[in-house]
Amino acid sequence: MKVGLVLEGGGMRGLYTAGVLDVMMDNHFMPDVVCGTSAGVTFGVNLLSQQKGRVLRYNCRYVGNKRYISLHSWLTTGNMINKDFAYDLLPRSLDPFDEEQYERSPAVFYATITNMHTGEAEYVQITNTWEQMDVIRASASLPIICQPVEWNGEKYLDGGLADNIPLDKCMELGCDKIIIVLTRPAGYHRNDHISGVCHLFYPRYKALLKTIANRNANYNARIEQINRLEAEGKVFVIRPSRHIEVGRLEQDADRLRALHALGVDDALGVWEQLESYLHKDGI
């Protein structure tokens, strides 16, 4: 049996995912493969480093701090999420990320990024977070409010533009048991309208603009696929059991705590079912 874990993006809605991952750590659960996008990457790496509570702790501690996520950072650096603070000072000094434990993990971790030239998703195995911090940052570089990230001679943006729920990659890697953590409740239908604005910011990147234009349809089709596979018992889905109003760049620490608590409660509520799914068919 090869177990995969798929982590949807969603900015600060990823605090729900962090709650689910904290329950996994409490239960000493580690998949063989993790495929994440955006916040599913920046928060998901903490499962491999076994740092329960870290995502909630640093987000609640620094939310509202203009050095972290702020209009001030956007106006002065071009990045609403300040790259020097979020991807250097914070993980190295303020709330250190345990790279040694990450590298000891038996799991492999893939980050999804969107190539601006091709408009396609690329999946990069993260073997060392410090050496590949640009990939991690690219996966969560939201269009317009974050600068593109250059890596290996190409420019990249948020992986969620091309593949917000990297299920196909997880299947391609041979996982026969797949757990999917979503950040939207059942029945959510994407209908955002960023395509027109992106034409003003990225007029030279025609393939990227096409990907963005198709983003709603592709996301909704992915959810339909997941719902079908879930009904067939082929994947196990953990999603918010109720709606909590949390924005992509939420600045209210109480809302973040509430969403994290919901992730914990939902994961605990389905844990026995998850174990049954993993051991079904006599495995």
Predicted segments with their positions:
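Patatin-like phospholipase
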Residues: 1-37, 45-283
